[in-house]
Amino acid sequence: MPSENLRWETLEALKNSPKGKLKYSPDWVEKGEDVLAGCVEVPSLSPLSGQILKRMSPRMLLKNCSRSSSVRDTSPGLSEEAAVCRSAPISPRLKRSSCSLPAVSIQTEEEEEKEEEEKAEVVVEAPAVSPEASVSTPPAVSVLSPRATQISGCIRMCEQKHKAKAKMELSLRQEQQERLVATVANHESEQLKRFEEFMELKQRQEHQSIRDTNEKEAQESLGRQEKLREEHRHRMKILNLRLREMEQQRLREVELERQRQVEGRERHRAINAIQEEVLQLNRLLQPQQSTHAEVEHAPYITRGNQLCSQLSEVVPAAADDQFPSVEDLSVAERALQEMRSLVRSLQEAVSQAAERKKKKEQEEEEEKRRQEQLKAQQEEQKKSAALSAKEKAKKEGLQTGADDSTLKWYNSLQDLANQCAQAFDDLNKAKDTQTKKLKMELQKAATTPVSQIANSSGAPLKEAFEKIDKLLSRRPVTSAGKTVSTSQHPQGLEFASYRLAEKFVKQGEEEVASNHSAAFPIGAVASGIWELHPKIGDLILAHLHKKCPYAVPHYPPMESGTSVEDYQKILGYRVDEGKVEGQDSFLKRMSGMIRLYAAIIQMRWPYSSKQGLHLHGMNHGWRWMAQILNMEPLADITATILFDFLEVCGNALMKQYRVQFWKLILIINEEYFPRYLCFASILHFTCIHWLQNIE
């Protein structure tokens, strides 16, 4: 089929032509560009155009030219293209490039294929043209057939279809992109939701973890608390057990203490009974008128006195609010057994002497018996005469109280103390805090050095003395880390003086009563302060006389209208809520104050620079001894204070008064003791024996 071949050759030639190589752009119409703007080459005939013209008939060529002339005015561009297409030969190169043209819609539609076939047939059936004719024709003939116009229209329709298709594809692409964007957005939103859900899950997990941790910690805390409660309950059980054991131990100790006190009281009563029996047996050792002269009683008496002294050392220790121990009781029992054996041996010696005497003087027994009777009568007469003389002396010489001058001196000292107390009454009753604080500091500064004396000596004793002297001299004193002076208040000196004197007497009442050796350092400091500040000495005497009237000496009588409790207070007893202190405690306190008074009388401050006599020296001690012996003795107290005074101050009195002192001792032994023995209790024979040993 030659027409079919020509069609394909034509198409190949069109494809290979410059216009067939135009690049399609859908923006030509919108931008107003020319379709052939890309082809600027001058149209020229192909070398093969001659062969084509030869094969075409002249009739067809003229027909085509007429068609082209009719259509030239309407579409000159297309006629030129058609002419070029007809005149251009079809080469294999154009066949190969035809596949690249964008004419897909022409090949797909049947009408376009038919038009192409008809065009190809026209080109093939054209008669051959001679070279001369081809040369004579104009070189650029523009032939535009209706078919070309149709093709051009088809091309434009194809372009429009392509544009519509492109628009449709673009809209589809946009829809696809929108769907893709929506899908991506949905996916991202889902991802965001999943992420938020993941974050919420993670947050819930964290919260759950925190909650679990808190619950675990709470459980652990509850466990620890329960453990602590259990430990607390366990400790409480242990403490309760310990408290129960301590309470049982305390009850056992109380029971043991009660038993100890019961046993101690029993031992105390036993020792008292033993002492009473020993003293009675000691009386049996004394030589009697009926005893034979050949028997020497001196060794027995000496040993009996030693046993009494040994026993008396046990009794005072038991009297100081303590109970005698089993060893003390055993010592007392051994002393009693020895005293009994001593009495038995004495009785045996007396009986043996009597037997010897009977053997030697059997012949003179009756005569000696008469002589003994006569001698006994004479002794009785002497005793009655001595008793009558003593009764007469009692009626004429001894006093029951202090004389008027002594009472006047006693009252003046009490008035001085009362005036001093009234002088600092405002300071004593002050209510403001500053004044109260000053009062307490002054009291500490006055009493603390006295409390520190005790058994001290040397530098500590001198330091205490200097502190007291500075305080009374209105100089500043450091006490408990604070500086205080009596000049800080107008009544400070009177207050400090009164409290200082009161503290000295209290030390004698308590410290000296328990520790007899403390009387000498305290007495030395008090004597030195007395020399520098005489008013302190008067206040010390006033406080001493008030607490111990026997230091005057004075036995206050019971006046009418005075109750028993008040009278006991006047005598020096302590009365607390109607309960009077025991006799042993009373004698112990009186002994301490008398010892302090005796120490003050004989002691001098060793560092004193003053010369001269003591303001209250040994002459007052001699006066006290004389006055106490001129007064009727009182049971217990007289022997106690007389012994304490002589034990502390006796040596000093002996050195100063010598013979007169020994005369005084003889009077005590020969006249005072017999009077005292008439009413003294057996328990206080110890003091009498001590006084006898002084002789």
UniProtKB/Swiss-Prot annotation:
Q: Name one GO cellular component term.
A: nuclear pore cytoplasmic filaments
UniProt-annotated stretches for the region Disordered: 203-226, 354-400
How would you summarize the oligomeric state and partners of this protein?
A: May associate with the NPC.
Compositional bias annotation for Basic and acidic residues: 367-397
Question: What Gene Ontology molecular function terms does this protein carry?
Answer: inositol hexakisphosphate binding; phospholipid binding; translation initiation factor binding
Q: Could you confirm whether the keyword Transport appears in this record?
A: yes
Chief location of this protein?
A: nucleus
One GO term (biological process): Schwann cell development
Query: Where is the protein found, in the record's own terms?
Result: Nucleus; Cytoplasm; Nucleus, Nuclear pore complex
Q: Which family does it belong to?
A: Belongs to the GLE1 family.
- Coiled-coil regions, chain positions: 105-126, 216-255, 326-433
- What this protein is called in its record is mRNA export factor GLE1
Keywords carried by this UniProt record: Coiled coil, Cytoplasm, mRNA transport, Nuclear pore complex, Nucleus, Protein transport, Translocation, Transport
Superkingdom of the organism of origin: Eukaryota
**What does the function comment of this entry state?**
Required for the export of mRNAs containing poly(A) tails from the nucleus into the cytoplasm. May be involved in the terminal step of the mRNA transport through the nuclear pore complex (NPC).
